[in-house]
Amino acid sequence: MPALDDIKSSWADEVESDSGSLPPPSEVIENGQKIVTEYKYNKDDKKVKVVRTYKISRVVVPKCVARRKSLAKFGDSATDRPGPNPQTTMVSEDVFMQFITNKEEEQKNENALDSMKNIVKCRTCEGEHWSFHCPYKNSAYDKPTKPTTAPVPETTSSSKPGKYVPPHMKESQGKPGIGGAMRGRDDTSAIRISNLSEAMTEADLEELVKKFGPHTKMFLSRDKSTGLCKGFAYVHFRSRRDAATAIEVLNGYGYDHLILSVEWSKPQNPQ
């Protein structure tokens, strides 16, 4: 049998056979790599050897960064080598900072975006897209008709003072009366919203459509006996462009666990 002295022991046994203190860390640079060897105790209170290999690379940094790297260390880290010490320094992930600009620059950016929006304009609904991409190209509203007003007879100075004139035929400072305005009402900017919840209220409808632009009239259909919503409503916008935007956004939009169906309101047959 070979003698016990001839058996080679491992490096861990050799380290444990020492006085009990950890050997100092060593650092070797060769072939463009830095090899750092350290000794420490693990969870089981055993000495372990940790070898770290770093690749050396040269980068160009700003002068302020180079000046910070040349600052002398102090305190408990006065004797540390250049670079972070893993026992006292934890390298975390990079945090990117976002600088907030002043309001004038933000306003300039918004004005630039608004000018870009006016480059493309649909001839059908005046939306911000090409005419052949318009979703309402083949609908009944692809060519909106101008509201026709009934001709108002001219009043002369020779008319009799006691003659009766219907209200809708009267003129006030060159403007048609109330009756003529109602007969010439433009419904081309009205939309119909379907598949609404029974709990829908006028306040909810106002909150739903007010972000698309000003409107002149809203009608929420309700049941006469129960007072609940019948499931549809009409909204008249001042601008047909705002109405087209509302249709594009709300059609297929999920609201109150239901999918809304929004379309152009069909014009009523003249009576």
Curated annotation (Swiss-Prot):
GO cellular component: eukaryotic 43S preinitiation complex; eukaryotic 48S preinitiation complex; eukaryotic translation initiation factor 3 complex
Cell membrane recorded as keyword: no
Region span, Disordered: 1-29, 143-185
Main location, first listed in the record: cytoplasm
Compartments, as annotated in UniProt: Cytoplasm
Keyword NADP recorded: no
Stretches assigned to the RRM domain: 189-267
GO molecular function: RNA binding; translation initiation factor activity
Keyword field: Cytoplasm, Initiation factor, Protein biosynthesis, RNA-binding
InterPro entries: eIF3_g, eIF3g_N, eIF3G_RRM, Nucleotide-bd_a/b_plait_sf, RBD_domain_sf, RRM_dom
Family: Belongs to the eIF-3 subunit G family.
Subunit and interaction comment: Component of the eukaryotic translation initiation factor 3 (eIF-3) complex.
Its biological purpose: RNA-binding component of the eukaryotic translation initiation factor 3 (eIF-3) complex, which is involved in protein synthesis of a specialized repertoire of mRNAs and, together with other initiation factors, stimulates binding of mRNA and methionyl-tRNAi to the 40S ribosome. The eIF-3 complex specifically targets and initiates translation of a subset of mRNAs involved in cell proliferation. This subunit can bind 18S rRNA.
Protein name: Eukaryotic translation initiation factor 3 subunit G
Gene designation: eIF3-S4
